[in-house]
């Protein structure tokens, strides 16, 4: 049974602003997430630490010369809600994750 994946409305706006290469690479990873669901593990998916969201995950992929991370969480209906994404290449790892997690948490509160 395939899992469902959906964009938070703000993440959908972010997605259309990404380069075509990033959109294609992200879509390929999302198809894998739909097929496998929450058991998809490292190196493709890992749990983000330091979040108030239980089991906030990151989908990892490379595209357009960047090192991309997409934060998501499964809601009570078994839907993977895509919350926030960004390229962590050339950015302080601590600052990148602080920003990614804060954005994901803010959007998650408006989703529930």
Where in the sequence are the language-model features?
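Basic, Lys/Arg-enriched alpha-helical interface segments
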Residues: 1-67, 76-80, 87-112
């Amino acid at each position: 049974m395939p899992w469902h994946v959906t964009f938070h409305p703000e993440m959908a706006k972010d997605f259309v602003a990404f380069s075509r290469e990033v959109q294609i690479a992200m879509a390929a990873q999302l198809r894998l997430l739909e097929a496998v669901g929450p058991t998809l593990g490292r190196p493709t998916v890992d749990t983000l630490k330091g979040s108030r969201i239980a089991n906030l995950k990151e989908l990892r992929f490379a595209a357009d010369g960047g090192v991309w991370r997409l934060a998501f969480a499964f809601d009570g209906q078994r839907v993977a809600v895509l919350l926030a994404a960004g390229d962590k290449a050339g950015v302080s790892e601590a600052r990148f994750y602080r920003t990614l997690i804060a954005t994901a948490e803010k959007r998650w509160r408006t989703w529930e």
